[in-house]
């Protein structure tokens, strides 16, 4: 089911940012829209009317930054999980709240990442996931870790598939 976006300006902004900088990540239209909605929600918290701007103008001026930072924070959360923290710390950080902001911290997400990790044969192949979320391209990852590009593509596709399961489940 497609997400609906009611703020046309924000939708266009999200599309523009997607085509300029996120094409290589293979995000779906729904994922872009959900990042845009998250950014809009974020920007409402930071908006201060005392400066005389309407929220629409403020969003137009700062929307791109909010969308980028929302995506960056999403990827940082993923990177934190991939950073091989000890299990006790992961348990302490776990939350029961399945809001779009918190679902990445759920046990379910950790299990999905572990399923993807099981496909990796060694520590170098596990590093593929960490480099991918940091924005490295497939070829760069292959050269850096001395793996074939085919193997890198395979591991990344598995990782994306597991993330998409959660994305569909939580709508973010």
From Swiss-Prot:
One of its GO terms (biological process) is DNA-templated transcription initiation. The lineage of its organism: Bacteria, Bacillati, Mycoplasmatota, Mycoplasmoidales, Mycoplasmoidaceae. InterPro entries: RNA_pol_sigma-70_dom (IPR014284), RNA_pol_sigma_r3/r4-like (IPR013324), WH-like_DNA-bd_sf (IPR036388). It comes from the Bacteria. GO terms for molecular function: DNA-binding transcription factor activity. It comes from Mycoplasma pneumoniae (strain ATCC 29342 / M129 / Subtype 1) (Mycoplasmoides pneumoniae). This is Uncharacterized protein MG428 homolog. Gene3D superfamilies: Winged helix-like DNA-binding domain superfamily/Winged helix DNA-binding domain.
